[in-house]
């Protein structure tokens, strides 16, 4: 099984220990997210040390004020590393508004362009910004992963456009029936699973820091939603990750 979105850099005990613990629990691969230049460098270094770890490079919307020609060039250089499989996470977050919306838009559009130039997948963060996120993505010419899927009202469009929908631990929460219905309905070829650790810990571990191996809890939950065996769904998710990230 694979965790397609993890922030290993901030986990208690260190990233290397987290990878080893996940491997012991049966998790074979992890996509470690670089949400700014420093985190991207750490993700690449971790991928160099562990055969089952892959990296993304990008600038999170919370940090979008950092976007500049220099940062864009640095991310482009990092994206050439053989262990880098995607650009992001990037996108729009109007819930927190840690950066101005204009800065978020510039950084998002710049990273879409980088994904298009490199041929790598684009990992998208969207929170309380559906309309503006979709307006950008409709013009994008790259593979799109809707990280921590938050657009259940737009599932049909996502499917029509061939965007991958990645569900995190919050799909297991009792007050998430819309996400659960989306996870049940999305075609198997567009389904991914992730932890977004250390955030969004799934039931029954909610209230503690999330870890990569807990994607297995989300896997079991979504498999039950879809009426299939967890092992069958794991194979589907791994195959989809291979396709979208070129693993």
Language-model-detected regions and their locations in the chain:
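Mid-domain alpha/beta scaffold segments of enzyme catalytic cores
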Residues: 1-247
